[in-house]
Amino acid sequence: KECMVDGTVCYIHNHNDCCGSCLCLNGPIARPWKMMVGNCKCGPKA
């Protein structure tokens, strides 16, 4: 799993799950929102 340089999207290679958390502008630890297959966007800080 990896976080992109802008810190807004997480991606994992198995297509089933969102990654746990990543660094985002809206908080150091953000909850990933389920988006498209294999992609997550960071949501509000949990």
Swiss-Prot record:
One term under GO cellular component: extracellular region
Keywords on record: Disulfide bond, Knottin, Secreted, Toxin
Chief location of this protein within or outside the cell: secreted
Disulfide bonds: 3-19, 10-22, 18-42, 24-40
Protein's UniProt keywords contain Secreted: yes
Tissue expression: Expressed by the venom gland.
Keyword Disulfide bond attached: yes
GO MF assignments: toxin activity
Pfam family, one: Toxin_28
Origin superkingdom: Eukaryota
InterPro entries recorded: Insecticidal_knottin-like_sf, Toxin_28
Location within or outside the cell: Secreted
Stretches the record annotates as Keys region for toxin activity: 31-33
Biological role: Insecticidal toxin. It inhibits insect voltage-gated sodium channels (Nav) by partially blocking the channel pore in DUM neurons from the American cockroach, not by acting as a gating modifier. The inhibition is only partially reversible after prolonged washout. In vivo, the toxin causes flaccid paralysis followed by death when injected into Heliothis virescens larvae. It also causes uncoordinated movements followed by full paralysis to sheep blowflies (Lucilia cuprina).
Description of its domains: The presence of a 'disulfide through disulfide knot' structurally defines this protein as a knottin.
Family from the record: Belongs to the neurotoxin 16 (SFI) family.
Protein name: Mu-segestritoxin-Sf1d
Organism: Segestria florentina (Tube-web spider)
